[in-house]
């Protein structure tokens, strides 16, 4: 009798440990939470060092996640497994309008962690602001989106690819982050006094201007760049006084 009880205890403990192990994040290059540490700054932050740290952090990407809403109105998405999910913070009427059309549907997520992972028993939660788009499907054509840049005095010019894939739309959150991160890595932005300027996105019914002297406003995080394969993106860099 005692042996049977002991075996049941051991079996239960083993199953519990296996269940706990299954909540660990997969060791993948772009989807592993352990690789991305949160570095949050206020949207009005203008300190160059803070902006550099924020736009140099690692991002997370997820495909075909399910977006859902709690009874209290908060927006969430299941990530790679049911025990790993995200709280999607949404601000502004246009971002909310886009999100509301995606409830209970498959979505793609470009995530920057607003805080460190919240771990509780058998559950882990990430916190992102925006970055959610309709999930790309096999019917969506593959394309490459390029960016051109120059300084205001036009002493130098250049360009680089900022996105390659088949997302039907892109969020300002994703494009802003990818563009700034690339410019920081190439020492074109927040270096040698080039601490301000604009990202201009036009074409295909788009008309956006992003201020490089501060973080992207939270209300813009889930606004869409429509027909991105036809969009024109230009960065103008300016020196601070």
From Swiss-Prot:
Superkingdom of origin: Bacteria
Organism: Staphylococcus aureus (strain Newman)
GO cellular component: extracellular region
Transmembrane parts of this sequence: none
Gene designation: ssl13
A Pfam match: Stap_Strp_tox_C
InterPro entries from the UniProt entry: Staph/Strept_toxin_CS, Staph_exotoxin, SuperAg_toxin_C, Superantigen_bac, Toxin_b-grasp_Staph/Strep
Keywords on record: Signal, Virulence
Keyword Magnesium found: no
Name by which UniProt lists this protein: Superantigen-like protein 13
